[in-house]
Amino acid sequence: MKHIILKSAALAFLTLGTMSCADDLNISPIDPQTSSSYDVKQLLAKQYASLGLTGQKGPDGNGDMSGDEGESGFYRTVFNLNELNTDEILWAWQDNEDMAPITNMAWTSASPRVNWCYQRLAYDVTLHNQFISEQTGKLPDDEIAEIRFLRALNYFEFLDLFRRAPFKLEFNGELPDEKVGIDLYNWIDQELTAIEPMMKEVGAYCNSKDFGR
């Protein structure tokens, strides 16, 4: 019995000694590439990049959404639903997946291209909500207003294409509400009216490193 007690005490001592070797309040990242800070300007750039790019590696790669990354961009998805069913476009390859319903204005939620558009708009709204929630009070009002404009643009496309939107203005774990028709229109109108005085003058960035915003 004495030997068992001694062995147990020794094991407990070694365990406590091992645990105390690390000062939990002063641990540095093991990976030297790891950083707890980030460049806010790069985060701002991502908000604008979401209009044209589809992922994290420039023109393609590590896509924002699963599926055919090339079909998932903001401009392309909005263009598909707005223009492919008009006289401005003649799409000769009607055997392409779900192309016939789109060109004949008979598309439904079963269409991959419709889903990509809906998901792209929802993803971008979430991206903008995160930026606005985390940076309001830290960045100038005009920069926050820019992203509020981009968010309103996505909600406008929701209204134009689907007449409704999963509506949310905060970045948290709560599910969005739904705004439909005139309610969504009124919010967009009020939001744009509210941010207009905060926006930079037209051409304010033309001679700066921020050209293109």
Indicate residue ranges for each PLM-predicted region.
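Bacterial Sec-dependent N-terminal signal peptides
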Residues: M1-P29
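Membrane-proximal, proline-rich intrinsically disordered regions
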Residues: C21-Y75
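Short linear capping/connector segments at secondary-structure termini
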Residues: D31, F167-L175
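Conserved, well-structured interaction surfaces
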Residues: T54, L90-F162, L175-N186, L192-S208
